[in-house]
Amino acid sequence: MWDSSYMQQVSEGLMTGKVPIDQVFGTNPLEKLYKRRKPKGTVGLQCSPCLISKSTSTDDIVWDQLIVKKTLADLLIPINRQMSDIQSTLSEMTTKVHEIERQLHDITPVVKMGKTLEAISKGMSEMLAKYDHLVISTGRTTAPAAAFDAYLNEHGVPPPQPAIFKDLGVAQQAYSQKTMVKNQTTDAADKMSKVLELSEETFSKPNLSAKDLALLLFTHLPGNNTPFHILAQVLSKIAYKSGKSGAFLDAFHQILSEGENAQAALTRLSRTFDAFLGAVPPVIKVKNFQTVPRPCQKSLRAVPPNPTIDKGWVCVYSSEQGETRALKI
């Protein structure tokens, strides 16, 4: 029979936990419910002892982030400063480049005038060379000493025109102890004293240096580095060594006055002038025959047994390999 008091005791025991459920029902009626709510194979997360010992609080993580941000900021500050300096330098360089471009644009016309300036310079050099030998080219002056002294006594200064003569009254007047002479007159006397050694025979035929004589001959020759330029140099050197450079130049001008050109005059003199008869052409050492002036390369021939200048052999080129070629006109 149903005993209400017993059931009350059982209920109180179950509620208080003094009486186990298995003792009353034999099996736990909630066991199936537990198994249904808790799937098979589900295992709770477990932390390793090493991880549990570490601090994983939010404050530590935030602090680490702040430290990283501060470090990055300290690194970026000098980088930003350097970038600013680089930008400033680039700006200055850009300005300078623009200024250089403007200057180059301004000097471009000057660069284009290079050929013109070179031609003017060459013309001026030739003109100065001719001016230095003006007396030689034009012959003797005819200004008498009396006219020079008369002009000096009247005006007190030498005349502007050149006056070269043997009897120099102005020289005696300049070095006189009793006469007060101006500086211009003294300078004129010093310059004229340099030609006192010239005589009537040697005045129009002075002994020029080989270089000056060759430069005078070049003014009559067309082109550059032609065989006739080499011939002019060789003849000038031989004439200078023999002391007949003045006579050679006088003979050259004489042939030109007859209507011949400079090439014909040099060829004629090389075969008729006494200083060149039987003269042996000089030997010029070169690295190879390609270094010989291009206009002369077509005139190179095999060296004959006894070459002489009066037979048209100008010079002999000797290469480093031991080969020889003669320049023939």
UniProtKB/Swiss-Prot annotation:
Main location class: virion
Locations listed in the record: Virion; Host cytoplasm
Keyword hit for Coiled coil: yes
Gene3D superfamilies documented for this protein: Filoviridae VP35, C-terminal inhibitory domain, beta-sheet subdomain (2.10.10.70), Filoviridae VP35, C-terminal inhibitory domain, helical subdomain (1.10.8.950)
Domain VP35 IID span(s) in chain numbering: 204-329
Manganese keyword on record: no
Signal peptide boundaries: none
Coiled coil: 70-120
GO cellular component: host cell cytoplasm; virion component
Membrane-traversing stretches: none
Keywords of the record: Coiled coil, Host cytoplasm, Transcription, Viral RNA replication, Virion
InterPro entries reported in the protein's UniProt record: Filo_VP35, VP35_IID, VP35_IID_b-sht, VP35_IID_hlx
PROSITE patterns: VP35_IID (PS51735)
Subunit structure, interactors included: Homooligomer. Homomultimerization via the coiled coil domain is a prerequisite for binding to L. Found in a trimeric complex in which VP35 bridges L and the nucleoprotein. Interacts with NP. Disrupts innate immune signaling in infected host cell.
Family: Belongs to the filoviridae polymerase cofactor VP35 family.
Function text: Plays an essential role in viral RNA synthesis and also a role in suppressing innate immune signaling.
Protein's name in the database: Polymerase cofactor VP35
Annotated organism of origin: Lake Victoria marburgvirus (strain Ravn-87)
